Amino acid sequence: MLKRTLLATAALGLGMAFAGAASAQDKTKACFVYVGPIGDGGWTFQHDQGRLAVEAAYGDKVETAFQENVPEGADAERVMTQMALSGCDIIFTTSFGYMDQTNAVAAKFPDVKFEHATGYKRDTPNVSTYNARFYEGRAVMGHIAGKMTKSNKIGYIGSFPIPEVIQGINSSFIHAKKANPNVTMSVVWAYTWFDPAKEADAAKALIEQGVDVILQHTDSTAPLAEAAKTPGVIGFGQASDMAAYSPSPRVSAIIDNWAPYYVERVGAVIDGTWAQKDTWAGIGGGEVQIGAISDAVPADVKAEAEALAASIADGSYHPFTGPLNKQDGSVWLKDGEVADDGTLAGMGFYVEGIVGDIPK
């Protein structure tokens, strides 16, 4: 960890020196803090695609800088502080665990704009938050999972037991169960966003339990690589398309498309219209996309999945529509009732049918 931190600090110094050199040209400086490597093929890769889109959109009006592999905690606060001191006009902090650090640093630098991904705290006027309705994409993946499983056992690799992740678990299970009433779900918690070894171990543990469809809310391609070792096991790209594993084991993907948001928000800094806001877009807004469904999926299942995605996109269907019960059997949503955003944002329970407890 010490070696990685030292390397990260050195790399940050180089990146910020580059951004500082651009200040004489009055370029807007957009900076990005990443929890994983840009080569992870998933979460961080997609955020970096957004950064590159900013460069493509604004050309010589903007300079970007980034730091990858920044641990959540004190290291993140140091990186954000250094970025602010080095002349960044807007800083995107791209992991839930950066929330407190983002707000702490923002309070010290009121002239710098901060954008925190997946969080909810906006303690000062220069902090905005943004997220994607990942649970919408999970509904589509869940439908495919329910139709494709032969063992009737699907598995889910969770990162941390926070509402965003629990939403995805519940949405996947609800729609797998609708597609296949006999399906069961096992959840394994990796307690990491990005750790290929731990993610592979989690996938292996699920496969050993007889799971033949794996979903994940972790950042690397390791679960798909593990699935590829066992004939008949399939999975889904997470955050990015992960098309290298198509047509199987990767049969589709939930793709996070951050580019339009990053281009919009940097543009607002450039033209002086930036204002604090909270954004939570989904399939309809283009922030959540469904990756190509491979030929390993039967045509009728593909058509059903595409129809489900379309109904979510146009607002005619909400993935959390009753009747739905909580895990303990108590009524959560009555027939036709739709979950409100406040409940979803604080979700801390499983729906009926999921076995196991949410870690505290």
Tell me the role of every PLM-derived stretch.
Residues 1-24:
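Gram-negative bacterial Sec-dependent N-terminal signal peptides
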Residues 24-360:
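A residue-level marker of the well-folded mature domains of exported/periplasmic proteins
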